[in-house]
UniProtKB/Swiss-Prot annotation:
This is NKG2-D type II integral membrane protein. Residues 14-35 are annotated as: Disordered. The gene is Klrk1. Functions as an activating and costimulatory receptor involved in immunosurveillance upon binding to various cellular stress-inducible ligands displayed at the surface of autologous tumor cells and virus-infected cells. Provides both stimulatory and costimulatory innate immune responses on activated killer (NK) cells, leading to cytotoxic activity. Acts as a costimulatory receptor for T-cell receptor (TCR) in CD8(+) T-cell-mediated adaptive immune responses by amplifying T-cell activation. Stimulates perforin-mediated elimination of ligand-expressing tumor cells. It comes from the Eukaryota. GO terms for molecular function: carbohydrate binding; identical protein binding; MHC class I protein binding; MHC class Ib receptor activity; signaling receptor activity. Coiled coil: none annotated. CDD domains: CLECT_NK_receptors_like. Its main location: membrane. The keyword Disulfide bond applies. It is found in: Cell membrane. Residues 1-51 are cytoplasmic. Expressed by natural killer cells and by resting thoracic duct CD4+ and CD8+ T-cells, but not by thymocytes or other hemopoietic cells. Expressed by DC cells. Residues 105-211 form the C-type lectin domain.
Length: 215
C-alpha cells in the first residue's frame, strides 16, 4: 500500500483585514446626492446678506434720491429766477432806435452838445433835430444823469405870467423831480449834477442837452 500523506484539509485562513481596508477606502465617503446638497448649501450661504449691508444700500439709495430731488428743485429755482431777471431787464432796458451818436436810455434818446449857445439858440438846435431841451421827469428812469458834472441848458424856464417854473411842454416843475437853486437874475435853468438845476441868465452861453422819445 502506498503511504498516505497527511494533508491539512482545514480551510485556509486569508488575511482579509488589508483587503477590507482597501475596499472601504475605495467606497465613496458620502452618500449619493450629498455633494450636490453641500454645494447648494454653500450657494445659499453665499446669497445670505448681512443686515448691515442692507442698511448701507438703503442709505445710499436715499442719499441719491435726495440729491436728485435737490438738484431738480435748484434747477427750477434758477430757471425761474433767470427768467424773472431777463423779463425785468428787458422791460427796463428796452430802447428803440436813436439817431447816430445819440445815447439811448430807458426808451429815450439823449445828445450832449459841446457848443456854447444861449438858451433860445440851444432850444432851436434841438427843435431842428426833432427834439427838445432836457426834461427831468423821473429820477429812477433818468438815473444816469446824476453822473453829469458840467452845466448844460435844459428845457426849464420861468413863466413871465406868474413866475412859476415850467418845462417847454407847459408842465409845471415838481420838487420831487429836481432841486432848483435860484439866483436873482436867472429865468432859465442849467442842469448841474445829482438832479440839481441852477437858474441863470438865458443869454449866457452854455452847452446843452437835447432829448427825444425813442421810436
Amino acid at each position: 500500500m502506498s503511504k498516505c500523506h497527511n494533508y491539512d484539509l482545514k480551510p485556509a485562513k486569508w488575511d482579509t483585514s488589508q483587503e477590507h481596508q482597501k475596499q472601504r477606502s475605495a467606497l465613496p465617503t458620502s452618500r449619493p446626492g450629498e455633494n450636490g446638497i453641500i454645494r447648494r448649501r454653500s450657494s445659499i450661504e453665499e446669497l445670505k446678506i448681512s443686515p448691515l449691508f442692507v442698511v448701507r444700500v438703503l442709505v445710499a439709495a436715499m442719499t441719491i434720491r435726495f440729491t436728485v430731488i435737490t438738484l431738480t428743485w435748484l434747477a427750477v429755482f434758477i430757471t425761474l429766477l433767470c427768467n424773472k431777471e431777463v423779463s425785468v431787464s428787458s422791460r427796463e432796458g428796452y430802447c428803440g432806435p436813436c439817431p447816430n451818436d445819440w445815447i439811448c436810455h430807458r426808451n429815450n434818446c439823449y445828445q450832449f452838445f459841446n457848443e456854447n449857445k444861449a438858451w433860445n439858440q440851444s432850444q432851436a438846435s434841438c427843435l431842428s433835430q426833432n427834439s427838445s431841451l432836457l426834461k427831468i421827469y423821473s429820477k429812477e428812469e433818468q438815473d444816469f444823469l446824476k453822473l453829469v458834472k458840467s452845466y448844460h441848458w435844459m428845457g426849464l424856464v420861468q413863466s413871465p405870467a406868474n413866475g412859476s417854473w415850467q418845462w417847454e411842454d407847459g408842465s409845471s416843475l415838481s420838487p420831487n423831480e429836481l432841486t432848483l437853486v435860484k439866483t436873482p437874475s436867472g429865468t432859465c435853468a442849467v442842469y448841474g449834477s445829482s438832479f440839481k438845476a441852477y437858474t441863470e441868465d438865458c443869454s449866457n452861453p452854455n452847452t446843452y442837452i437835447c432829448m427825444k422819445r425813442a421810436v
